[in-house]
Amino acid sequence: MIPGELFIQDGEIELNAGRKTVTLSVANTGDRPIQVGSHYHFFETNPALKFDRKKARGMRLDIAAGTAVRFEPGQTRDVQLVALAGKRMVYGFRGDVMGKL
C-alpha cells in the first residue's frame, strides 16, 4: 500500500443516498456573480438569490464536497438541495438560524 492510496470498488458512488431532496429554481437578481459552496446552508444565501427560502431551510446543495455552484447576474437555474445531516444545528452563515432546525 502506498500512503494516500485509495482502493475503490467497481460501480457508481451515489452521493447523499437516502436523504430528502428538493429541486428549486434560483434566480440571481443582483449585478454580481454569486457562488455558493457545497455545505453552505442554502436558506441563508445572498438575498439577491430569489427562490422559495422556506423549502431551502435545513438544506444544502446536493453536490460533491468542496465544490460550488455559480449564479451569474440575471441567470436562473434549477438546483437540487439535500437535507443537512447530523445534529441539524446551524450556526454562523448569515445568523438567520443560530440553533436547531
From Swiss-Prot:
GO molecular function: urease activity
EC number(s) recorded for this UniProt protein: 3.5.1.5
GO cellular component: urease complex
SUPFAM superfamilies membership: Urease, beta-subunit (SSF51278)
CDD domains: Urease_beta
Catalytic activity: urea + 2 H2O + H(+) = hydrogencarbonate + 2 NH4(+)
Oligomeric and partner information: Heterotrimer of UreA (gamma), UreB (beta) and UreC (alpha) subunits. Three heterotrimers associate to form the active enzyme.
Similarity comment text for this entry: Belongs to the urease beta subunit family.
Protein name stated in the entry: Urease subunit beta
Native species: Bradyrhizobium sp. (strain BTAi1 / ATCC BAA-1182)
